[in-house]
Amino acid sequence: MAEVNWQQLINQKRATREALIPEQWLLPATITSKVTPQSTASAFELLSEAGLLTEREIDITEKYTAVSLTAKIATGELSSYDVATAFCKRAAIVHQLTNSLTEIFFDKALERARWLDEYLSKEGKTVGPLHGLPITLKDMIHVKGQYSTMGFVGHLRHPPADENAVITDMLEAAGAVFYCKTNVPQTLFVCESFNNVFGRTLNPYKLCLSPGGSSSGEAAQLGLCGSIMGVGSDIAGSVRVPAIFTGVYGFRPTVNRLPWSKQAELALKGWQGVQPTLGPMARTAQDLTLFMKTIIQAEPWRYDSTALAIPWHDAPRKDKLTIGVWSQDPQFPVFPPIARTMASAVGRLRAAGHTIKIIEAPPTMKAMKIAMRWFALDQVNLPLKFVQDGAESPIADLDAMDPGKFLDPGYVADLSENISISADIHDYREEWAKIWREAGIDVLLCPASRGSAVPHGEFGPLMYTIPWNLLDFPSSVVPFGKADKTLDSKDGYDSTVVDGAPTGFQLVGWRFQDEQTLMATEVIADTLKA
């Protein structure tokens, strides 16, 4: 068998992707020459400098939420076609500034949008609650006829998907318009944005900063308004950290509230350890609720045997919440931008009449060690196997989440550990149950990350997100404030490099209380905007 020239396949893949951007949407070299992972430039400023978007396109892509945009389309004030065109064009521009797309199918999107307009005109009603809404998808989510390489070199020889993922079918049935898929890091198990096929995705706020991971491309597109709603996934923080790094909202639901089936393979079938879940990313808290309500009301358990048959129930709005506040783990203290903006948010919530309860939490390292013991049980390790199959080099960022770094020397993973790990998870959950009961809280407010976006390659372990994956607690991210080189200047901390980067916090609810967690997210977001 002839030796495969992987670099040639990589070059072909990238060239094919770039050729799908219409010539009139291409940025001039005077702009693209400034786009490097070392640049301190803002993609917002570069987009404005390019001047390719019309006032109407800017209006469509920036003015609306998903809730208000679908309402405008439903009444005919905006056409699905015009909306799709505006978002396709902006996504293409955002990609050229951040390297955030893997698959581009704008032609399919415009064809779909035209059909939706004809349906609305003929039938006098929408297809569903997401009629005409452009939605971006993380690369692992199958779209029939499109590739799902996930940045694995060995996957470049795989054929395109022959069917949709269940989530793709359900969103399409609700009226969504798909137009592109987004970049991920190698293995999808690091909070970074680099793989050997597509390269590195950049943060739109400052190109030298990371957009987080593994839903890297989703975050970059949403942050710069190339997307209004996206679908990511989360097994250790992969929705939430990118959300906080790019100033958008993200939600990690209880596992199996959303369908997982028929996606690109990343783990052994039937894996019952710490499990991944899909999760929406958007620009408002209300849009997160729109996504979750739309899918769950459509009864995903009818299409996916792993989805839980738990109907959607609207959580009554509580204008005065009891909020537990966990400011940090002393072993992993948060950096000044997070400490400052979290304190500001808590102060404003208290002033608005919400009850604040200060929480002392179990060490995050306890959760990390338990989770890593789970991950170590997977002796196959499909993502790493995919790297080896492609004879590609593992990226340096994988070291941050290497299970061996958190396990005792000489630790041997075997299936007998399953019972011990399950018992430890039970005990850890009981610790949190006691805290929840004694404080009587509706939701927990805590960090999502030690800091705001970091320079590429400098993110450490996911200490503030992985506890909730281990316990399977629904959790959201609320963007609030920005890093400030003057206000955040502290001894030993370089506040200049992250100046202007978004900050925010995480909200955590009890298991299966997704609706209540989303309600609290809306209330808290509304309070902070007032």
UniProtKB/Swiss-Prot annotation:
Induction conditions: Expression is induced in response to 2-benzoxasolinone (BOA) exposure.
Where is the catalytic site? Answer: K138, S214, S238
Q: Which residues bind substrate?
A: S214, I235, A236, G237, S238
InterPro entries cross-referenced by the UniProt entry: Amidase_CS, Amidase_dom, AS_sf
Task: Give TM regions.
Answer: none
This protein's pathway reads: Xenobiotic degradation
Enzyme Commission number(s): 3.5.1.4
Gene deletion effect: Does not affect BOA degradation.
Q: Which GO terms describe its molecular function?
A: amidase activity
Matching entries from PROSITE patterns are given as: AMIDASES
Which Pfam family, an example, fits this chain?
Amidase
Top EC class of this enzyme: hydrolase
Alphabetized, the UniProt keywords read: Hydrolase
Tell me which SUPFAM superfamilies the record gives. Answer: Amidase signature (AS) enzymes (SSF75304)
Q: Which reaction does it catalyse?
A: a monocarboxylic acid amide + H2O = a monocarboxylate + NH4(+)
Further comment found in the protein's record: Fusarium verticillioides possesses 2 unlinked loci, FDB1 and FDB2, necessary for detoxification of antimicrobial compounds produced by maize, including 2-benzoxazolinone (BOA). The FDB2 cluster arose as a duplication of the FDB1 cluster with rearrangement and expansion by incorporating additional genes.
| Function summary | Amidase; part of the Fusarium detoxification of benzoxazolinone cluster 1 (FDB1) involved in the degradation of benzoxazolinones produced by the host plant. Maize, wheat, and rye produce the 2 benzoxazinone phytoanticipins 2,4-dihy-droxy-7-methoxy-1,4-benzoxazin-3-one (DIMBOA) and 2,4-dihydroxy-1,4-benzoxazin-3-one (DIBOA) that, due to their inherent instability once released, spontaneously degrade to the more stable corresponding benzoxazolinones, 6-methoxy-2-benzoxazolinone (MBOA) and 2-benzoxazolinone (BOA), respectively.
Q: Which family does it belong to?
A: Belongs to the amidase family.
Entries under PANTHER family matching the protein: AMIDASE-RELATED-RELATED (PTHR46072), GENERAL AMIDASE-C (PTHR46072:SF5)
Can you say what this protein is called?
Answer: Amidase FVEG_08295
Say which species the protein is native to: Gibberella moniliformis (strain M3125 / FGSC 7600) (Maize ear and stalk rot fungus)
